[in-house]
Every structure is written in C-alpha cells, then in structure tokens.
Amino acid sequence: MSNTNFCSDTLLDYLYTQTLPTPLPPDYTKDDFSKWQIKKRNEVQDLLRIQELSNLLSVPVSAQLIEQFYTDDVLIEKYCLQGIRHLNTPLFIAGANNPASKSILYLHGHDKFGIQGALKHLEASPYHKYLPLLLAKEGYRVYAPEMIGFGEAHKQHYDMGNSKEGSCFPNGTQLLASGFSLAGLRSFQAMKIVDFMKQQNAETISVFGISGGGMGAMYLSACDSRIDHMILSGYPCTWPDTLFVHHHCIDNFVPGMTRIADGPQIISLFAPKPLLLLTGKTDHVFALSGAQKAFSVVREAYQIFDCPHQLQSFVFDGGHETAPELVIPWFRDRCK
C-alpha cells in the first residue's frame, strides 16, 4: 500500500540532517578544536551579518543620562545610548555608584515590561527574581539594556497588547525580508554596549543571559572576545529539543543557523573561559533532557582544554527562571 501520510515531519527532519555541518573527527586534538573554534566564530559572525551591520549602522558610542531612581536602595541610572545609526538603546545601570571595574552585562529575555520587569516592582515575570538589584547590592555595576523589540524599544504603532514577545514579530519579519535577523541586530547592539562599558573603564566584563537573553549572551560571546565570564540561565539546550518542538518567538531563528552548529556547540566556543550553565528542573521551555545533552557537549570542550574546573553546570529546583543562590556565589568567586 502506498504511503498516504501527509505530515511534514519526515521532510523537515531529512532536510535538517542533510544540512548539518561536518563534525570533528573522533580523535581530534586540542589544536584541532582551537582551529575549529576560530572557524566557527567567523561563521557565526557571518551568519549574523555583523560586519555588514557595522558597515551600515556603526556610529561613535555616546550616552546621555536621562533619569535616576532607586529601587530597594539601589541607585539606577537610565541612559539613552547611541552607537547604532537610527537606533537609541535604553540602558539602565543598577549600582551606578559601584566601581566600574566590576561590570556585568545583564541581557533579559521575553517580558511584557522589557528590562524594567527586573528593575522595578511591577507585575513582573518571576524569572528575573530582581537579579540585577541583588548583584548591584553585591557591589557590581550592572548594565541592563532594553533590547530592540521590547518595552520602550518597540516598533512604533504596533499594538503589543499584553504580549511578552513585545514587537519581536514585526521587527523580525522586516529584518528577515532585508536579509538580517533580530539575533544578529541584538548581537551588534550588545557589542555596542560593551564598547560603552569599556569607555566606563570596565576592567573585566561578565555577561549574564536569561532565556532569550541567554541566546543573546551566547552569540555575543562568539562575536566579541572581550567577554571574560558568562552565565546562561534558562537557555542551554539542543535546538531539536526545544526550537523544533515548541512555539518560540521569531527572534530565536536565523536562516541557515543549523548549517553552522547547534546551540551547545556555539556555547562551546567560549571555552576555556569561566562559564556557568543553569537550568530549572521543571523548565517547560528549554526541556531538561535537551539541557543535559547541552551540558555534556560543552563539558567535552572544557575537557579538551584540560580545564573542567572552568565550567560549572547545575540543575536547580525550579522552572523557567534563574537561581540567584547559584549566580551570586559564582560571581563572588570570579569577579573580585
């Protein structure tokens, strides 16, 4: 009897497997892996169109202070950051009176309040747990930008309603039609914020990314060698275990991305620098099974460099959220 199954699954899986990049041979050396990292970093930057974005949009970085306020006794300054032609970035600095030498870039995920859900007592998404404020109280200067598509940085005249996805969809579709992507533009945006952090005399730069901000941190670390430490929370996972089986925002997708590498392999480009990976046991967005596979892939990279101590990974009791009780001690040990 002929096959009368009209579903698309087999076709999609076939195309995915047929376009996967060639894996490293089983007997690869540390030197082989280092060369692979260089190659993949270049491929990721090409995928995100970083050089083209820079050619089209880069202008000198400057910032204008527009507001100061306190939340839980933490001084927060709001700046209008310029560095991208035709795009101003709302940038909040929590612990603005703390020394610039201890600087953390905090990249948020989807929240109907944008970054302000992590900085003000609003009806906020619980996954932030006000971590920027807690880190500021530890003496860090926390740079918390509102990335394009969220909060104030939305597409004008687009009715976001109560959606936590902000205006990602209209931004993302127009960028895709022009050959760009939200992931690429946000990576370039984050690199401009790092430029500003360096202007502020940041000696070391750490990046923390939660959920979609984890994707941003992952791509940033592959594009910008100035990142010294990284924490990914509620994001590390194999793409087939999350992006292909659940509804996800358009900002997760870049045409051709699976031809370059899977997410855990891109995270591995950060080796041998200090890295912390976190996932909640009951995370419904980035499944535990896929997260554990991701941990294993990244662990191999650190073993190749003979520095397994530089990587820590934890499964904590919780869902799609972060774990300040793990994040804060990790920063204390590494960012003194």
Task: Give the ranges of each region predicted by the language model.
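Short beta-strand element of the alpha/beta-hydrolase
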Residues: 91, 101-111
